Amino acid sequence: MDEYLENTNLEELEQECFMEDYQHEDVVEQENHQVDANDIYENQQMNDESQLNQDVKISQQKEQAVEMIEEQQQNNQDKFKQFQDCMAHITELNFKRNYQNLTEQSSSNNVVAEELDIKESLKLQMEYYFCDTNLTHDSYLRGIISKSPKNCVDIKVFLKFNKIQQILKQIQDKQIVSTYGIENQSQKKNHKNYKNQNATFSKKDLIHLIRDSLKESKILKVKMDSLKVKRRFPFNLEQALKNSKQRTLYIDFLPPKCSKQTLVSIFGNFRIININLPLQKNSQLCQGFAFIEFFSEEEANQALITKNSSIPKELILLTEKKIGQGSIRIITYKKWQEEKQSFKELSKNQNEQKNKNMNQSRKASDEFVSIDVEIKQNCLIKIINIPQGTLKAEVVLAVRHLGYEFYCDYIDENSNQINSNKISLSTQQQNTAQCSNIQIENNLIQQDQHPQLNDLLKEGQAMIRFQNSDEQRLAIQKLLNHNNNKLQIEIRGQICDVISTIPEDEEKNYWNYIKFKKNEFRKFFFMKKQQKKQNITQNYNK
């Protein structure tokens, strides 16, 4: 019994020891797990902090890169703005150098009054060749630049240009004078070294001279080793044209004797960089309009405000007969393009309608069918008190500036007929004093052919019919601008009154006359066509 108890106690003791060992191992294992978890947490925290620091560092680097890019872009924009200002200044200097004898400038503004240094002249001319103003119109040089590698042009190419040759000739002349002591023109002509200029300067020397003159250029970069030149900023034709149009004004109602000298005198208070004044081929007279490009868009707008609808004294002196002339009209280049496009669309619509009517006429039956005329309200003006004996060409000349296409009905007292003149004017012809270039369709109607025709137009009267009411309002505004807010026009040196509001009965009577006239002409051509058919049939039967 004692032995049994002893064995039992021993087993219990062993079991207790086993449980204690197990619990101890479990505690140790839990402690180890806790240590591992703490280590993992600490490592994760360290990794998170490292990643955060790295992200902050990357973000700072990105911000610095963005700031550097923005600063670089701003610097490039500033440099490009300086580049454009420098180009405009060079263009202005070149214009003044070419036209300094056209106007009297003050000593402060006459930049080129003093003789420029030869190298400075060479630099100015080379810079002008690469300016936007010149490259916009110089397709030859644009082609050379585009075909050259990296837009670098050999300097030797410019030795063939006329302006460069003139400057180089001045250099050679000075060199000969200083070397051989030539003092007058007769000695120059007889001197062998003057006749043979290559004895003084070689082609290589001239190229090096051009290269050296461009070292300080703000517009051009020169490669000293390869003797090539290029712009500091590439040329963009589309942007250059856009900038040029923004600072260009269109001026019309100029007299035939107007010249570039006159325009320089009128706009002498503003900086001009280019004048385009088209001339007639035979007479070399002004076609009546011009394009002037100013130094900046702001100066162009200021010139528009200051000079528009004015009567410059320079033009009054040129105008012997003020027929439709006086104040000039100035509009922006964009407005001129809109007017030009509007006129093209109007002409296109009229041609389409004309072709449509012709096709309908061809398909018509053998019986004549009269047509109706659309009555257009408020598109007439009437001129009265026209001097006796005035010819139709003189009336046309007086009203030619009122619109692009309109009709002029006028009684020719010599033939006792109504002369209905369709006047079609291009933009150039609108201001041309010569009537020979104006397309006129003469439609003659006997006065006794239409009832109430004598009440429509009496002696010394003319009716002007425009395409629509908008063109009529524009014509009235032109008359007011030209005649100090008076509805008048000058014909044969006599002031004639203009009536802008036609009574309703008279207007209705006029449109009845237009309908009658059109049908009379259609009937005339219809009968002529029928007669032609009969002749063909008779000849065929024979």
From Swiss-Prot:
The HTH La-type RNA-binding and RRM domains cooperatively bind to TER RNA UUU-3'OH sequence after it is transcribed by Polymerase III. UUU-3'OH-binding by the HTH La-type RNA-binding and RRM domains positions the xRRM domain to bind to the adjacent proximal stem-loop IV and central dinucleotide GA bulge. Residues 247-335 form the RRM domain. It comes from Tetrahymena thermophila (strain SB210). Residues 112-239 form the HTH La-type RNA-binding domain. SMART domains: LA, RRM. One of its GO terms (molecular function) is telomerase RNA binding. Its main location: nucleus. Disulfide bonds: none annotated. One of its GO terms (biological process) is telomerase catalytic core complex assembly. Keywords: Chromosome, RNA-binding, Telomere. The keyword RNA-binding applies. The keyword RNA-binding applies. Coiled coil: none annotated. Residues 374-542 form the xRRM domain. SUPFAM superfamilies: RNA-binding domain, RBD, Winged helix' DNA-binding domain. This is La-related protein 7 homolog. RNA-binding protein required for assembly of the holoenzyme telomerase ribonucleoprotein (RNP) complex. Telomerase is an essential ribonucleoprotein enzyme that copies new telomeric repeats onto chromosome ends by repetitively synthesizing the short telomere-repeat sequence 5'-TTGGGG-3' using an RNA template component TER. It comes from the Eukaryota. It is found in: Chromosome, Telomere. Component of the telomerase holoenzyme complex, composed of the catalytic core (the catalytic subunit TERT, the telomerase RNA template component TER and TAP65/p65), which is associated with two heterotrimeric subcomplexes: (i) the replication protein A (RPA)-related subcomplex, composed of TEB1, RPA2/TEB2 and RPA3/TEB3 and (ii) the CST-like subcomplex, composed of TAP75/p75, TAP45/p45 and TAP19/p19. TEB1 and the CST-like subcomplex are tethered to the catalytic core by TAP50/p50. Disruption phenotype: Critically short telomeres. Reduced accumulation of telomerase RNA TER. Belongs to the LARP7 family. GO terms for cellular component: chromosome, telomeric region; telomerase holoenzyme complex.
